Amino acid sequence: MIDRITEQPFCQARISGSTFVNADCFDVFPFIEDKSIDAVIIDPPYFEVKGNFDFVFKSENDYLQFIENTIIECKRCLKDSGSLFIYCSQEMSAYIDLMLRKYFAIKNRLIWFRSGGVSPKKKFKVSHEPLFYCVNDIKNHTWNLDDIRVKSIYADKDKRLNPLGKSPDDVWCIPNLVGKKNEKVPHPTQKPLELCDRIIKCSTNENDLILIPFAGSGSEFVSAIKLNRKSIGIEKEKQYYDVAVRRLSKYCG
């Protein structure tokens, strides 16, 4: 599967059996076979002013059509037992919720509570991002609960509880990356590795193949390699591709 992409004249970096491509994801999709991907993580532009990549959409409808086209391609690539995660802005979440229902079973409507950021004076502070967790088959998909359990406050008091902990809530309190944190790189919407790790651990097994069509700073790609998964990362913007490749070289040697 990955060989079909590496044979193409894309600018790309091969790392640990995975590939990170500098291209538009719609130029790469044709080289990905139907039902060949175990999980997809979509972190698309948000139709907000967060960098040059958000200025390409002429209207809200134009943006939503772009998102639906992405979902359709990812649906084609995904195995019947596969999972798809997609981030979006709060403003777009209702539209994308309805859109996803046409193609998937929505298993969870997760909230990434990220804190940080500037507190506005005329409205409540925006401190979370929606994250949809979807599956092709609600009865048959990879779900590794034991790999993501969190400690229960009652763990020491009730011996009947699972010693590995409880299932995480649907609100994930994982701090955003700000300032000079060790993993911070020059990217406006970089996701923390802790967040990416949880997504990948719960929905895939070792040696599974993950598709990341908007790979950005490379966080999901780094997590996949750390966790012994294969991945196809795609990033259109050359400046962020270069940032990610430098980061991958550091993490993956």
Task: Walk through the language-model features, giving the residues of each.
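Conserved phosphoryl-transfer catalytic core
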Residues: 249-252
